[in-house]
Amino acid sequence: MIRQAILLAVALMATTACGTRESLPVRPPVDSPVIPPSKIVDFSFLYARNCAGCHGPDGKGGAAIGLGDPVYLAIADDATIRRITADGVPRTTMPAFAQHSGGMLTDDQINVIIGGIRSRWAKPDALRGADPPPYRAPSPGDPRRGAGVYGIYCSSCHGADGRGGRASSIVDGSYLGLVSDQTLRTTVIVGRPELGAPDWRDDVPGKPMTSEDVSDVVAWLAAQRPQFPGQPYSTALQFRGGVR
């Protein structure tokens, strides 16, 4: 038995020794390049690691606005997208990515992401012949008028009270607590085509929304936002003077 075990061990050693050099694990060369994370400037890599989780791997289909939507890219200029990417949007799920705002990306990397989004997905003629509402609201909307605008342009999908119909609820407190008024405005203007939500031109055929319509319906939606999203809490968690 001992002799057989020795012969088996020798055979295994011989087999291993016959392996090619390429098949054996080797230490990387001393001069092998190691790229620091801050020096990576490949768009596909940066987008996949920092953007795809919320905005979708191809700029659409994610929980957030589609960065690959040509209509969005036609109304939002590079300075706007850069500011949002660098500094984030307070009180929403959009974090800051720039190092100067507590993120991990350099200014050069943010420029690479913006340039890649623009070159890959923008279409110069996306709004040819159209007159879209401006990205930013020129003036505050009126929630009372907004209720009427909602009834005309939105209720057929989201229900008469906004709590859902063919499409999901648009007055859900948790949703409204996670988006800014600007996000609501942008979504109303550009829609979510991958989810079946039309842009400002196609809610009512032949009657596109005006900038005032958009501002008013956003004001109405914002008025539905709870002061403290997530409440009411269970009475078991409440105590005199506040919430545990």
Placement of each model-derived feature along the sequence:
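Bacterial N-terminal signal peptides that target proteins for export
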Residues: 1-6
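Hydrophobic alpha-helical targeting segments used for export or membrane insertion
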Residues: 7-12
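C-terminal motif of bacterial Sec signal peptides marking the signal peptidase cleavage site
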Residues: 14-17
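Flexible coil segments in periplasmic/lumen-exposed cytochrome c-class electron-transfer proteins
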Residues: 19-33, 37, 41, 45-48, ...
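Gly/Gly-Pro-rich "capping" loops immediately C-terminal to redox-active cysteine motifs
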Residues: 33-37, 44, 60-86, 96, ...
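Conserved functional loop/turn residues at catalytic and ligand-binding sites
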Residues: 50, 55-58, 153, 161, ...
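Intrinsically disordered, glycine/charged-rich N-terminal periplasmic/extracytoplasmic linker segments
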Residues: 50-53, 57-61, 65-84, 90-96, ...
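Calcium-coordinating acidic loop motifs
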Residues: 89-90, 192
